[in-house]
Amino acid sequence: MAQEIYDIAIIGGGPVGMFAAFYAGLRDTKVILLESLATLGGQVTSLYPEKTILDVAGFSATKGTDFIAALSQQLQRFPVDIRTQTTVVNLEKSGNLFTVTTNNGTFIQAKTVIVATGKGAFEPRKIQVAGVDNLVGQGVHYFIKNKHDFDNHHIAIAGGGDSAVDMATMLSHIAAETTLIHRRDNFRAMEQSVKTLMASKVIRETPKKILSVSKQPDGRLKLRLAHVKDNQQVNDIIVDDLIINYGFISENKTIQAWAVQPKLAGQVFAVNQTLETNVPGLFVIGDASHYIGKADLIAIGLGEAPSAVNAAIRCFDPNRGGPGHSSSMVLKDTIVRND
């Protein structure tokens, strides 16, 4: 039996990869979606399930888990071949076909490939305070799976970016007391998020750093804070939980081992106006791609997905019409024309 050949193989099952797979189904292509984790959703599912997403069109505010659930439901409309716990360990190209080798020992052939892996594997940026790592899971957290684990708790959040600011505001509605610790007086977050923070009941400890974290006899944590310019100017706070949100360190070691190596722009892939790399038929979307003016937002990646899919189709079927509009396609036996 001849090996099955896909029109498009999409590597990465985060929001951008999921939407690309849906749109590929909308264009009636044979598509496979490969995700290394056990579930779809990427960083939104793994790192920010409780975070409120504000910058996606059509959603005034949506929780990360709800957003991924909506994408999953949308994806079920078409027979996309979805394989989770599948890491692409090699990508080769021979003639007009790509061969994808997975950690499961399977070989997948595709006419085109769309990479939507984000910045790659990720791990939290650790706080550089002695002894804190021993307290992870005992009041110190790098991830939040369920915000209600902090109901009526006294909590401290270390960080000053979008995630830390949004988390502090969100948890202030359910925690007994919320303190945000940042090394600067100014926060590196969206302007409206900062305005919301300033109007909230969150206590701001700035410009401060954490000197030490110690476990108290009652199980709570004592945080010794110091002014960033004067270690003698200190104060202590007692909390139930410390959430460290210094961002994440990412790497693409797996991709670096591929036989196919498209041109890089720093640590991500350089693409042209159709999201294609210098390797014909290989496209990159989302945070893994770079072009002049690129912003790393979910909304941007979602917009790139249809462009990459349409360009991929033109690679293996130049005579095919497109790009396609959903309002002129067959959906559940109903045709609507936008004449």
From Swiss-Prot:
Binds 1 FAD per subunit. Gene3D superfamilies: FAD/NAD(P)-binding domain. It catalyses: 2 reduced [2Fe-2S]-[ferredoxin] + NADP(+) + H(+) = 2 oxidized [2Fe-2S]-[ferredoxin] + NADPH. The keyword tRNA-binding does not apply. It is an enzyme of class 1 (oxidoreductase). Homodimer. Belongs to the ferredoxin--NADP reductase type 2 family. This is Ferredoxin--NADP reductase.
